[in-house]
Amino acid sequence: MHEVRVLAFQKIYSIDINQSAMDDIFDIFNIEDKGLDIENESIKSFYSSLVNGTFNNLEHIDSLIRDISWNWSLDRMDKVDLAILRMGVYSLKFQNFENSKRAVIDDAILIAKKYGSKNSCKFINGILDALLKNMEN
């Protein structure tokens, strides 16, 4: 499902950067062009869950990021990093991935390697790992 996470990250980033509405979360990115079957309900549902869930829980997600990222305000964070973090926090906190929470973090790191800056991976790993440890305690 890495490809679906990449598309969801791109949509989350696009909505944030363009300050656009979420009227149709499938409007900007043609999932079929990415080799994914949009008619597959599990793919469509997972994508929708990531995008809608992230924005529906944005206040809580941002609060968690602020609590963990000590000296970083959300305004100072790179928008790519913030989009990856928001989606990662949503997945860890609200989706049922009991056996694969580490995989959520690994996926976020892979996305950061491709789309983020040279320090994005460490930054994102640190915050998501701290959140996971807090959740386990």
From Swiss-Prot:
GO terms assigned for molecular function: RNA binding
GO CC annotations, alphabetized: cytosol
Entry keywords, A to Z: RNA-binding, Transcription, Transcription antitermination, Transcription regulation
Single Gene Ontology BP annotation: transcription antitermination
Pfam families assigned: NusB (PF01029)
InterPro entries reported for this sequence: NusB-like_sf, NusB_fam, NusB_RsmB_TIM44
This protein's record includes keyword Transcription regulation: yes
SUPFAM superfamilies (alphabetical): NusB-like
Keyword RNA-binding belongs to the record: yes
Domain of life according to the entry: Bacteria
Signal peptide: none
Record-stated family: Belongs to the NusB family.
HAMAP family: NusB
NCBIfam families with a match to the protein in the record: nusB
PANTHER family (UniProt xref): ANTITERMINATION NUSB DOMAIN-CONTAINING PROTEIN, N UTILIZATION SUBSTANCE PROTEIN B-RELATED
Protein role: Involved in transcription antitermination. Required for transcription of ribosomal RNA (rRNA) genes. Binds specifically to the boxA antiterminator sequence of the ribosomal RNA (rrn) operons.
Protein name listed in UniProt: Transcription antitermination protein NusB
